[in-house]
Structure formats: C-alpha cells, structure tokens
Amino acid sequence: MKLKLSLCLVSAAMLMISCSRPGIVANSTVTIQSPLKSVSIASYSDTSSFSTVSDPRFLQICFDTVLVVQQTVHTEDDWHFKAFSTVTSDSLGSFFLNGRGPGEKSSPHMEKTHSGDNCLGIVENGTGSLSVVDIKASLQSDFNPVHLETCTLPSGVISSASLGDSSDFLVRLEGETLHYDAVSKDGRTTMTFNPFRKVNAQKSITQLSSILMSNEKCAIVAEVMLFLPQINFYDVASGKIKTTAVDKAAFDWRPVMENMIGPETVQYYQYAAYSPDYIFAVYCKSTLAGRMSGNAQTAIHVFNWEGDFLYDFKVNESLSDITYDARSKILYAINRADSRIIRYELSEYL
C-alpha cells in the first residue's frame, strides 16, 4: 500500500511540474492538479433530523458536537441561528432574533471556522460589527449568546479570518488594490500580500470574490476563488503564496476580470469548509444561469494545507453550503433541491 501511494504521489508531482504557469496571482505560478483519487459517494439523511429549520442557508460545526444553522428569516420573530446536537440531532436552542434592537441582528453572516473551535465569529453585513460567540458557554446558559468579544472591523475590510488569539487575516480594498494583511490584536501589520496587483480590484471586486479559511497551526490562509478554478495559499510566516488549480481555465483569467458578471459567467467554486488537516470546496463549473436553475451538478474537492488535490468526491446532489465534523469525519451539506441537511460519511477516505 505504501509503495502504491508513493508511486501515485510521484506521478502527481510530475504532472504538476509540467502544468505550472503564471496566473493572476503576482509572484506565484498556477499549478494544475488532478485528484489523487476520484470517488462517488452517497449521502444519508432522515426526515426528522433538523426538521425545525426553515430554509437553511449556511452551516457551521462548533465545539465538535454542535451544528449551527443559519436560516432564512422573514419576520422580526424569526431566529437567524439554530443549534443542534450532531450526536442526537436534537435542538439545543436559537439565538439572534431578526431585528435592530439589543441582542438582535439584521443581516449577519458566519465566519468559517473548524469543528473543534468553541467560538463562532458573526459579522453584521453593512456595519462590519464582529461578534465572537462562545458556543460552549452559550450552551450552558440555554443559548443566551455569551460574547467573548464585540468589535468593528477596520474601514474597507471586505473579508476576514482568525489566526488565533494573537492575530487576524484581513482583506481590505484601498483604491484599486486589495491588501491581504496579517494584523496583530494590537493593530500591528505583521505580514502583507498584494496578490492581485495585475488587476484593478475596484473594478473587478465581484470577479475576485472568494472564501477565506485559516489554519493557525501552520499559519496558512486558504482563499477559495469563486470565478476561477483555483485556491491560493498564503503562508503568513514566510510571506510566500502557492496557487493550486483544477482546470486550465485558471490561465485564462484576463477575460474573467474584464467582463461584467452575467448569466453566462462561469462559477467554479461555491462553498467551502475546513479542518486542521483538510480543505473542502463545493465545485460546480456552471454558468450562473445554470446554477440558479438548480440543474448544476456539484462535486466536493478535498485538499490538504500543502495545496495537494487529494479527492474529487462525486455526489448525486446539487449542494450549497457545507461544514465538516473532524471528530466523526462527517461532512454536512444543504441539498439545493429540497433545502434539507444531508450528510456524507468520509471516515473511509480521511
């Protein structure tokens, strides 16, 4: 088995070297990779699991045993977030009513984290207000949210990821430039990147849309791009950038940046999740019109934090958001067809 794996890795390395060329990221080459393994996997679910969720939008595992679901809200009496046990599927409580009063949120979104993290960052869109909620402590108080920290993100910040207790990774638009900065809690910039200097970021800000995820253990931030088939890895310690792509369309980035987003624009990645060992990304390679029709098939791509493309999981469903439980090795996903939360058992592979 070890010999076969070694041969496979060597073959993959040879392929990567032959397919490396400059791309959109400055001072970095794009490496086209094929997966080490392509596998079809089946989902499982039951009708009673998470039945109280109304139109789930986003998912996040916290504290290893809690699934937090952000649902669509319609009235001021609706909760934005509901929490469930991943062991029993029982409801654990709800938090943040829809509204603008004390303890309420009007347009929140969850920051990505890994399943072992006790805390969940929730950003209020429009104001940049960041609330860090201690999920473990909130459980012990009947889900009256326990805030560890409430702050406002700096002006111009459009995306962020935590690098632990000491620093954050901030993406900030300043004029025509996107700055990617590691910033300590006392406000010092400890590392900065300017990856998209070939592009007028102000004009192409939508085309540069991405999902940020961070691994404080290895001080790497992964950026899953939506309109290019690639993931950028920012090494905060060394200042180096590595880019892994899954399709040669990554080389043809100029038309993507220059053309307006429209129904025929191709979107490659849609949603993502991570653990300290793996990155999971929902891959569709479909026009926006095809995706909105619900006919676009999706796959789940799995990478390690070194940027190696490990698995291409073929699924029967068209998926939206995902989250991964590293303890049980179960991937949770939202099935776009019926808005139900489904699961994939991955312990055989990871």
Indicate residue ranges for each PLM-predicted region.
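Loop/turn-rich, solvent-exposed surfaces of beta-rich toroidal or solenoidal domains
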Residues: I261-V302
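Conserved blade-ending motifs and adjacent loop-strand segments that build the rim/top face
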Residues: S51-T52, G101-E104, A250-E258, W305-A326
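Beta-propeller blade signature
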Residues: F81-T86, D181-K185, N295-D308
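A short helix->beta-strand "capping" segment at the edge of beta-propeller domains
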Residues: S28-D55, W305-D308
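Repeated scaffold domains used in trafficking and secretory/extracellular systems
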Residues: V53-Q60, E104-K112, L153-G164, S204-L212, ...
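Beta-strand-rich domains and repeat architectures in extracellular enzymes and scaffolds
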Residues: S45-H80, Y278-T287
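C-terminal motif of bacterial Sec signal peptides marking the signal peptidase cleavage site
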Residues: L15-S18
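Blade-loop segments of beta-propeller domains
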Residues: D90-N125, E149, V199-K203, N316-S320
